[in-house]
Amino acid sequence: MGHTKNTGNQTPEDLQVNIPTRDFIRLHRNDDVRILAFSAGKNPEVDVPFALDQIKGWQTARHKLPLWASTEGIIYPPHLNMEQCSSEQTARYKQKVLASYYQGDDAADCACQSSHVKRTDKSVGEGAAWTVDGVLMDLTGGFGVDFSFLSRCFTKSVYVERNASLCRIARHNFGLMGLSNVEVVNSDGIDLLKELSADNTFLMTGVGSRLPLFIYLDPARRDVNGKKVYNIADCEPDVVSLVPLLLSMADKVMIKLSPMFDWREAVRELPGVSDVHIVSVRNECKELLVVLSGKPDELRKNGFRIHCVNDDDDFTFVFGGEETSLLGECQGSIDGSVLLVPNASVMKAGCFSELALRFGVSAISVNSHLFLSSHTLENFPGRQFCVVAVSSMNKKELKRNLAGITKANIAVRNFPMTVDALRKRLKIKDGGDIYIFATTVYNDSHVLIITKKIV
């Protein structure tokens, strides 16, 4: 994330790391930094604070940013910046979104014509297998993870960050990663954009045509005191007030928001929304991406797309501005059915009617957000379970249906007890291959649906 406080940064001003410090980092990068902090002071030539930052950074990157972790010589920023940066998986997803705009079905809707798109000899693993003869501007550079993937798609890319230390780190790392045609600017992104808006010759080609501009922002979601903010307008920079400027300059604008934000509020406050991407990794909602286009009136009329993404699953639908509530409830037997549990992105979107219509399934009840099918479904965005028994909360029924079950995974949906309270009442330990869903059915009865996982 751009615009973060860079507290505790121990990075040398010139990024030159002496040999003892470099060797110490390499030797101990798999060790516990808490223990190292007490034992590392034995060698006076080792820059211990810097070394510990690098070891912690690499340990985070090993899982979050494997490409970076495998690149020798990468300099990592303080822990806060590492926590806030995108993962490699979500950064690659943003790159995939770009592909849809500039070379996919959406290319006709973008100011970038096909003549601007060129094939390259890169593999998908290295980055984009194509480039746009255009400009990327990341106005809130931060550690530069998203920039490192998006910049591979453009012939020119500009990373803007007002923290001088992060700029030095970015310049160093981009060189190691083989990123060419990138410019690192130590400035406030919005101030720079305002300057360029007065004279946008930087987008003009030698023959007088205009290059497409793609702007990316990741506004800080904390105030000056470090407290989280919960309104889009309270983020820094305030993207709501900046929309006219952004759309006057760019053909497309991508804004990364907290997954805690309501996408409906984002659409209300940000004119020109063409796409909303709710991005989850391993069923945990990580990012809310909002893409703006320079045609707000047309988009309001025709609606926009909502992409519910979880790893390789992508459930996309067009939202016309009105919620549909045509959700049919199952009023028959649940036994023997397939229980469908939507993934985190679908849950965040709240698009349950669209889901039911697309797959022809019934809801257990309007507010339970669990669905039933007579068979397994291909490409369903979520998990699927075989229902082996259904029990009321009657003691005798519970005893009969739970006989022999000592361990189970328990979830509650629209149910008057917490997981812990229910587990205590049922006297069942956590784990095993049984999944119990406690919920409320169409007639307001509380039931336990006992299942085994299929997908």
Question: How does the language model describe each region?
Answer:
Residues 1-455:
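SAM-dependent transferase fold signal centered on methyltransferase-like domains
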